[in-house]
Amino acid sequence: RRASGAGRIRVNNAALGPAPGRELMTLPYRFGLPIHGWAHLRTGQRRPGRPISFSSTRTLKVEVRGVDEYCEDHGIDRVAFMKVDVEGFEARVLEGAARTIDSHRPSLLLEIEDRHLDKYGMTSADLADPLRERGYLMYAWHRGRWARVNSVTTARRNYLFAAQGGL
């Protein structure tokens, strides 16, 4: 358990976002079962998500925390890596992690898809460009390794952002 780091894992019943509060979350259902991987916060949503193949949705009121606030509250003094896959809400999660990103310079593995970002009025460039301006390099998994890329394409969904000299 110690070698795997499992003792440091904490499960929290909260969503991540730009600031603490309570927000509405949409939870899609398919064949009567919840599709948790497609759940998304409605904060700032400009249009409903595409009902790809779900038959209904449920609206939940959930606690939202910012990464910066969470780290301060739990005495976390080092963040090396963040995986953010939140159905288009990635920029808002990063907004709530601004101090953590600037001080710790963690590697960031982000799902970036215009079809999800669009519901919040954003594009892939709106998400990737500010990270590059902060000195992050962008990579995509290609032929068994992380390869440097300059833009987001529809051929890939996940992109690794690493501070210069960090990969």
Task: Identify the function of each model-found stretch.
Residues 1-167:
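Phosphate/nucleotide-binding beta-alpha loop and adjacent structural elements of enzyme active sites
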